[in-house]
Amino acid sequence: MAAMLGDAIMVAKGLAKLTQAAVETHLQNLGLGGELILAARALQSTAVEQISMVFGKVQGQDKHEDSYATENFEDLEAEVQFSTPQAAGSSPDFSTASSLDQPLSSSLGHAHREGPAPAYVSSGPFREAGLSGQATSPLGRVNGRLFVDCRDLFLANSIQRRFFHQDQAPVGGLTAEDIEKARQAKARPESKPHKQMLSERARERKVPVTRIGRLANFGGLAVGLGFGALAEVAKKSLRSENSTGKKAVLDSSPFLSEANAERIVSTLCKVRGAALKLGQMLSIQDDAFINPHLAKIFERVRQSADFMPLKQMTKTLNNDLGPHWRDKLEYFEERPFAAASIGQVHLARLKGGREVAMKIQYPGVAQSINSDVNNLMAVLNMSNMLPEGLFPEHLIDVLRRELTLECDYQREAAYAKKFRELLKDHPFFYVPEIVDELCSPHVLTTELITGFPLDQAEGLSQEVRNEICYNILVLCLRELFEFHVMQTDPNWSNFFYDPQQHKVALLDFGATREYDRSFTDLYIQVIRAAADQDREAVLKKSIEMKFLTGYEVKAMEDAHLDAILILGEAFASEEPFDFGTQSTTEKIHNLIPIMLKHRLIPPPEETYSLHRKMGGSFLICSKLKACFPCKAMFEEAYSNYCRMKSGLQ
C-alpha cells in the first residue's frame, strides 16, 4: 500500500510540474507573461505542498518507501526540468526580495561574455533618451524580447525555491491593474526594438582582388548573357508592355530575361565595388525608368551584397588596425549584419560596453574602380540593355571620381563629424558618433543606431510618413543652400527611422560633396523660376549655368524646360502636394529619350550628384505616399539664402 502511495506521490508531483510548464507556455503564447507566470508558479508550489500534506501520514509510516518516492520524483524532475541549471558556485542569492529585482542583464552578463544576442539592436543614443532608471546594457533590452524563454526559465528554478521556503506575500499582491499593464506592454509595437539583419540571400563569397580575377567574372557574365539572350529569343518571350501601355527605358532587349537578370545580380554581388554601386544606383529608380522586373532584382543588390570570408575580413582589419585590434573590443561579431557595394558592417562592443558598428572595406575595390566600370559598361552596352546616351563618357568619368572618394573612409569620417556638428541640435535628425580609435582608410567605426530603413516605413501612419518626408526635403534644401555640403546618396538604407524616439539617423557620408556659392547662386534662381513656373526665366538661367548652349533644337529646349518646370511643381504648390499620386516621374520619363538624343553639351558636373539626391528624395516621398505643401519650405530656404548672401556682401 505504501509503495502504491509513493508512486502516486511521484506521479502527482510530476503532473504538477508538467502542468506548470504547460500553463507558463500558454501564458507566454498569449503574451501574458511576467506577473501571471509568477502567480502560476505560486499555485503550482501550493498544489505540491497540498499533495504532500494529503499523503503526509502515509509517508511517515514507511520512511524507506518515502525515500524511494522522493528519489524517483527527483529523477522525473531532472527529465522534465524546464529551468536553466546554474553552474556550481554561481547561483544567485534569492534570500531577499531585492535580488529578484536586479536587471537580468547583470545576472546573465557573465554567461554571455563571449558575445551578445544577435544584437544589431543597441541601447543606442535613441534608446537611452528618456529611459533613466533602466538598464543601459543592450543585453538587458534585447533579452527582454529575444530571450524571454531563457530568462523566464532561469527565474523558474530560483523563484520555485523561493515559494517553497519563503513568504509568498509579494505574489499575493498581484492586481487586475498589474495584469492589464503587463498585457498592454506586451502588445505595444513601439516597445519592440528594431534590428538590422543581413539579407537571407546573402552568401559568403571571397571578393576577387586582382584585376584578372575580376575581369574573369565579367567575362563569364558576358558569355552567360549571350546564351541567355539566345534562349530568350528562342522562347519568343520578349518583355511585353506594362498595364499603362508604356515601356520602361530598359525594357527593350532580349538580353533582359529573368535568368540574365539573376546572372547580373549574382556577378555584381560577388565582385562588389564600383560595378555593384552602379547597380544600386539603378535600383532606386522609378519603375517608369527601368524594367519593373529588373528593379525587383536590383532591389536585392541594394539591400545586401554577399559578404567576404572571415580570413579575408580579418586580414583587412590586421593590415589597417594592427594585429591587436581585438584588444580594444570586448566582443566582435564575425558575421556581418549588413553588406553593401564597398564594404560590410559588423557588430562590436567596446571595453566599456558600448556597442558600435564597424564598416570594413572589401579588398581591391578601390584599386579596381576604373576597370570595374569599364568592364560593366562594356557588358551592358554589348547587350543593349541601356539606351544610347544614358551613361555618356563624361558621366562615367564623374562616377569614377565619386567612387574613388567614397573608398576613402577617413574622408567619410570627417564629413560625418561635420554633419553631426551641423545637426547637433536638430529635433528630428541624428548623426551617429565616430569612434576614432577604430577608424582607418579602410575601416570606419561608429556608434550603433537603432531603427529600420525607410523602405520599411510604408506601414507607418500618414502623419509620421509626412513628417519624415517633409524633413528630408527641408534637409536637402538646407544642405545645398545653407550648409553648401550635401550627402548625395539617397539610398533608403542611409535613413534609419527609430519609432521609439521618433528620429531619423543619417548614415553613410562617403558620397558627400561640397558646392561653391558660384554654383548655388545660379541654381537657386533656376529653382525660383521653376517654382514660379516662369518658363523664360528658367531658359535664361539654364543657359547661364551651361545646362544649354542656346543653340539646341526646339525639341531639346522644350524637353529641358518641361523637366525643370515639372520638378518645380511641388515647390509651386501652396496646397498639399500628393507625392503618391503625382505623375512627375512618368512625365520626365517621356522626356528622357529626347534629351539623350539632342543634348549638345553635358550638364554641369555638380548636377549629377545633386539631381541624384533630389530625385531620390522625391522618390522616397512618392514611395511613402507623402502629402504636404512644399511652397513654404522653399520660400523660407530662398529668403534665408538671400539674407545670408546680402550679409556676406
Swiss-Prot record:
UniProt gene name: Coq8a
Enzyme class at the top of the EC tree: transferase
GO cellular component: extrinsic component of mitochondrial inner membrane; mitochondrion
Subunit composition and interactions: Homodimer; homodimerizes via its transmembrane region. Interacts with the multi-subunit COQ enzyme complex, composed of at least COQ3, COQ4, COQ5, COQ6, COQ7 and COQ9.
Known EC number: 2.7.-.-
Activity: how regulated: Autoinhibited by the N-terminal domain, containing the KxGQ motif, that completely occludes the typical substrate binding pocket. Nucleotide-binding relieves inhibition.
UniProt biased composition (Polar residues): 84-108
Start and end residues of each stretch annotated as Disordered: 84-125, 183-203
Domain notes: Adopts an atypical protein kinase-like fold: while it adopts a core fold similar to that of well-characterized protein kinase-like domains, a number of features are positioned to inhibit the kinase activity: (1) an atypical AAAS motif in an alanine-rich (A-rich) loop that replaces the canonical glycine-rich (G-rich) nucleotide-binding loop and limits ATP binding by establishing an unusual selectivity for ADP and (2) an N-terminal domain, containing the KxGQ motif, that completely occludes the typical substrate binding pocket.
UniProt topology in membrane: Single-pass membrane protein
Membrane-spanning ranges: 215-231
Sequence similarity: Belongs to the protein kinase superfamily. ADCK protein kinase family.
Keywords per UniProt: ATP-binding, Kinase, Membrane, Mitochondrion, Nucleotide-binding, Transferase, Transit peptide, Transmembrane, Transmembrane helix, Ubiquinone biosynthesis
Binding positions for ATP per the UniProt entry: S341, K359, T446, E447, L448, I449, N494, D508
Protein name: Atypical kinase COQ8A, mitochondrial
Pathway terms, separated by semicolons: Cofactor biosynthesis; ubiquinone biosynthesis
Source organism: Rattus norvegicus (Rat)
CDD domains: ABC1_ADCK3 (cd13970)
Function: Atypical kinase involved in the biosynthesis of coenzyme Q, also named ubiquinone, an essential lipid-soluble electron transporter for aerobic cellular respiration. Its substrate specificity is still unclear: may act as a protein kinase that mediates phosphorylation of COQ3. According to other reports, acts as a small molecule kinase, possibly a lipid kinase that phosphorylates a prenyl lipid in the ubiquinone biosynthesis pathway, as suggested by its ability to bind coenzyme Q lipid intermediates. However, the small molecule kinase activity was not confirmed by another publication.
Subcellular compartments: Mitochondrion membrane
One GO molecular-function entry: protein kinase activity
Short sequence motif KxGQ motif: positions: 277-280
GO BP terms, alphabetized: phosphorylation; ubiquinone biosynthetic process
Residue intervals of the Protein kinase domain: 330-519
Active-site residues (renumbered): D489 (proton acceptor)
Disulfide-bonded cysteines: none
One Pfam entry name: ABC1
